[in-house]
Curated annotation (Swiss-Prot):
Belongs to the protein kinase superfamily. CAMK Ser/Thr protein kinase family. SNF1 subfamily. The lineage of its organism: Eukaryota, Metazoa, Chordata, Craniata, Vertebrata. This is NUAK family SNF1-like kinase 2. Its EC number is 2.7.11.1. Stress-activated kinase involved in tolerance to glucose starvation. Induces cell-cell detachment by increasing F-actin conversion to G-actin. Expression is induced by CD95 or TNF-alpha, via NF-kappa-B. Protects cells from CD95-mediated apoptosis and is required for the increased motility and invasiveness of CD95-activated tumor cells. Phosphorylates LATS1 and LATS2. Plays a key role in neural tube closure during embryonic development through LATS2 phosphorylation and regulation of the nuclear localization of YAP1 a critical downstream regulatory target in the Hippo signaling pathway. The modification N-acetylmethionine is found at residue 1. Disulfide bonds: none annotated. It comes from Homo sapiens (Human).
Length: 628
């Protein structure tokens, strides 16, 4: 198997003073935080990994493989994610995996899961990641129901520090949720799962509508283009609400109610007032131009209360939780001067949904709901065209669909992880319309929430397709994309024994160029042409759980470097975002849907069982006419 190793780019070794200078300046003071520099380099020696790791337990499962806790020969605990290439459905999934590896290996932050090594051979990709021993934040809050304000501030500061660092490097996460926020042995935050992340550019819009329903911003649920950071800001508002109040801010039991609440910024009235309510209101502003940015959050007085410095700088909390100098008071005064805009006129109406939607006599306190990521469509609609198209014709032929509800109840026990699918995205950057005042037309709304699946692990979440391989029948997902524009299915023969799929130059700009043209996929060095289906060397069921590394040999590679301003693909079309009101077409675009046998053929009596269908039908009409 080939391995991707994270080695520094060759060149002159910087002095100790040069290395210490950016670290002393801190993340916030540095205009562009340093990212790890890596280059693709092929090693010609093999690596046998069987004796390097001792597998201990399974942390998560996905369609592509598993995530296992393992111990290196040095004694260090790691999380090993194995991806079987024969499970990769198409090139979009492949590009999705590669993007996650490239972005996560380029980011270097204490509160972001680090990738140590990536190994690859003809049948597997093995990613060795940092191990977070205390699980995810969802389980942590589930066990405690509600955190103290001091603990909530501690977690939120670390989350903000990591997301702020990503935004300074033009990376938007787009899937911030409790399930993707892990805790290490020391109780520190580790953000995982960058499968839906992307690069963004000021002056360009992203056309990808993805994420998780209860954390999705108004732009996402209404199908409007967005720059990028504002969707993370909204998700941070939802996370802060949960950390402070211990409940979800929006009602996820009915997708119509959820869309209405998010669109109006009408979150539940908190059961108990908190000093963080002002920041929550600012983060949950419907208007993205008035929504708090990560810079605003990092300098907010509530976030920095009890700390000598703001988020990202050298932190030294004081005893008793009160600032020991005038720095916090000065920061608060500065924030009050900058935020003199009327927060109560932001359109985020704090409505009491306990009174409006609570069942009579029942408990109205909502619990947390585990979220699955939104899927991405196989092909992106042209945003420039959709912004000027008339949506009346689109909505006229879409039949209604009954509401799809999530199960009610408080926090559920953790079960085996099942990853949700995502499809890789076409280029999603589009220029801002010439007339900024012209609002984009609303897109046809479709269902948001679907049947829930098993819980996800932060190690195994967004990049994985659903267990069944269905495109439109997975749980807790938005599905968007015009079926008529979907690509024809790839020959399954392309999925067998593909070599070196992570060995391309690895530039983000290359990804968009490759996917813009119709190509097959296999090795990223040289995409293989289609070939007929060949029998696998052994059936998939014969692969043992402990055979992730087995006795195979691995080649070792370096990860690609990060290029500035690379155009990336989008992941979901605009046309199909907020609902699922029309049945998917059965054309060639629906290649990932599970085949289902026609129920008529299995019924006790069906016209398909008759020899003369026309005669039987006419006889039935005559009987009906006599009865009437």
């Amino acid at each position: 198997m080939e391995s991707l190793v994270f080695a520094r780019r060759s060149g002159p070794t910087p002095s100790a003073a040069e290395l210490a200078r950016p670290l002393a300046e801190g993340l916030i003071k540095s205009p562009k935080p340093l990212m790890k520099k890596q280059a693709v380099k092929r090693h010609h020696h093999k690596h046998n990994l069987r004796h390097r790791y001792e597998f201990l337990e399974t942390l998560g499962k996905g369609t592509y493989g598993k995530v296992k806790k393992a111990r290196e020969s040095s004694g260090r605990l790691v999380a090993i994610k194995s991806i079987r290439k024969d499970k990769i459905k198409d090139e979009q999934d492949l590009m999705h995996i590669r993007r996650e590896i490239e972005i996560m290996s380029s980011l270097n932050h204490p509160h972001i899961i680090a990738i140590h090594e990536v190994f690859e051979n003809s049948s597997k990709i093995v990613i060795v990641m940092e191990y977070a021993s205390r699980g995810d934040l969802y389980d942590y809050i589930s066990e405690r129901q509600q955190l103290s304000e001091r603990e909530a501030r501690h977690f939120f500061r670390q989350i903000v520090s990591a997301v702020h660092y990503c935004h300074q490097n033009r990376v938007v996460h787009r899937d911030l949720k409790l399930e993707n926020i892990l805790l290490d042995a020391n109780g520190n935050i580790k953000i995982a799962d960058f499968g839906l992340s992307n690069l963004y550019h000021q002056g360009k819009f992203l056309q990808t509508f993805c994420g998780s329903p209860l954390y999705a911003s108004p732009e996402i649920v209404n199908g409007k283009p967005y720059t990028g950071p504002e969707v993370d800001s909204w998700s941070l508002g939802v996370l802060l609400y949960i950390l402070v109040h211990g409940t979800m801010p929006f009602d996820g039991h009915d997708h119509k109610i959820l869309v209405k609440q998010i669109s109006n910024g009408a979150y539940r009235e908190p059961p108990k007032p908190s000093d963080a309510c002002g920041l929550i209101r600012w983060l949950l502003m419907v208007n993205p131009t008035r929504r708090a940015t990560l810079e605003d959050v990092a300098s907010h007085w509530w976030v920095n209360w009890g700390y000598a410095t703001r988020v990202g700088e050298q932190e030294a909390p004081h005893e008793g939780g009160h600032p020991g100098s005038d720095s916090a008071r000065a920061s608060m005064a500065d924030w009050l001067r900058r935020s003199s805009r009327p927060l109560l006129e932001n359109g985020a109406k704090v409505c009491s949904f306990f009174k409006q939607h609570a069942p009579g006599g029942g408990s109205t306190t909502p619990g947390l709901e585990r979220q699955h990521s939104l899927k991405k469509s196989r092909k992106e609609n042209d945003m420039a065209q959709s912004l000027h198209s008339d949506t009346a014709d689109d909505t006229a032929h879409r039949p209604g669909k009954s509401n799809l509800k999530l199960p009610k109840g408080i926090l559920k026990k953790k079960v085996s992880a099942s990853a949700e699918g995502v499809q890789e995205d076409p280029p999603e950057l589009s220029p801002i319309p010439a007339s900024p005042g012209q609002a984009a037309p609303l897109l046809p709304k479709k269902g948001i929430l679907k049947k829930p699946r098993q819980r996800e692990s932060g190690y195994y979440s967004s990049p994985e397709p659903s267990e069944s391989g269905e495109l439109l029948d997975a749980g807790d997902v938005f599905v968007s994309g015009d079926p008529k524009e979907q690509k024809p299915p790839q020959a399954s023969g392309l999925l067998l024994h593909r070599k070196g799929i992570l060995k391309l130059n690895g530039k983000f700009s290359q990804t968009a160029l490759e996917l813009a043209a119709p190509t097959t996929f296999g090795s990223l060095d040289e995409l293989a042409p289609p070939r007929p289906l060949a029998r696998a060397s052994r059936p998939s069921g014969a692969v043992s759980e402990d055979s992730i590394l087995s006795s195979e040999s691995f080649d070792q590679l370096d990860l690609p470097e990060r290029l500035p301003e690379p155009p990336l693909r989008g992941c979901v079309s605009v046309d199909n975002l907020t609902g699922l009101e029309e049945p998917p077409s059965e054309g060639p675009g629906s290649c990932l849907r599970r085949w289902r046998q026609d129920p008529l053929g299995d019924s006790c009596f069906s016209l398909t069982d008759c020899q003369e269908v026309t005669a039987t039908y006419r006889q039935a009409l005559r009987v009906c006419s006599k009865l009437t």
